Amino acid sequence: MTRAVCLLSGGLDSPTVLAYALSNGYEVFPLSFDYGQRHKKELESSKKICDYYHLNLKIIKIDLRAIGHSALTDNIDVPENDLKSIGNDIPVTYVPARNTIFLSIAAAYAETLNANEIFIGANAIDYSGYPDCRPEYFNKMEEALSLGTSIGLRNGIKINVPLQYLTKSDIVKLGRKLKVPYKLTWSCYNGRKKACGKCDSCLLRLKGFMEAGDFDDIEYEDYPEFYKTYLKNKHFDKF
């Protein structure tokens, strides 16, 4: 059985990737980061997801608040946007070099497991415009890790990005097929009791469920107008 490290954030995408890797016969080692993010509830979700799949979650603590310069790690407000404005520019929720840091640590962890594959739930279609979610980034990062690690020199490092060219609705459909427990997930950038329904992450998540003809059954403080209209038209009982 091929071993692989899977980066797990507890949101919509990474649990789908985890389920995908398991369904393809990998021995998966989930890895999450406590990096000083305001939405620490995602770590609770990661733990619940790993409990669901009977997997041991490794959490590594790194304090990216020391770097700051992001609405997720600094005293910067999380913006409330609309769907049309998402992806037009690099948003303030971008954490500087986060995927580079995470993938580097994942590669180090993989070396200790004698594993040379990493799974990550990045997406380059319905996303916020982060530079470290682009296909060309992952290609170059794969090259760098293959050159800069012991196991990479022997076998190469492979970064698997199975959701890279999928829309959010495609991801939801795949997740339903794989029976991902989306009720346990958390995508919101705000660390409140309920998802805000207004940040980029909430909007893209709800857009995905809407376009998949599905219903997102986590709790929200409020729904955006496009999702309210969708629920009314679909006659969902929960609305």
Curated annotation (Swiss-Prot):
Binding site residues for Zn(2+) = 188, 196, 199, 202
Domain of life the protein comes from:
Archaea
Q: Where does ATP bind?
A: 8-18
Q: Which reaction does it catalyse?
A: 7-carboxy-7-deazaguanine + NH4(+) + ATP = 7-cyano-7-deazaguanine + ADP + phosphate + H2O + H(+)
**Required cofactor names:** Zn(2+)
Indicate the enzyme's highest-level EC class. ligase
This enzyme's EC code(s): 6.3.4.20
Q: Pfam families annotated for this entry? A: QueC
The UniProt keywords, alphabetically, are: ATP-binding, Ligase, Metal-binding, Nucleotide-binding, Zinc
What is an example of a GO molecular function annotated in this UniProt entry? ligase activity, forming carbon-nitrogen bonds
What pathway is it annotated to? Purine metabolism; 7-cyano-7-deazaguanine biosynthesis
Q: Which CDD domains does the record associate with it?
A: QueC-like
Give the note describing cofactor binding and stoichiometry.
Answer: Binds 1 zinc ion per subunit.
Which protein family is it in? Belongs to the QueC family.
- Function, as annotated: Catalyzes the ATP-dependent conversion of 7-carboxy-7-deazaguanine (CDG) to 7-cyano-7-deazaguanine (preQ(0)).
Protein's name in the database: 7-cyano-7-deazaguanine synthase
| High-level lineage | Archaea, Methanobacteriati, Thermoplasmatota, Thermoplasmata, Thermoplasmatales
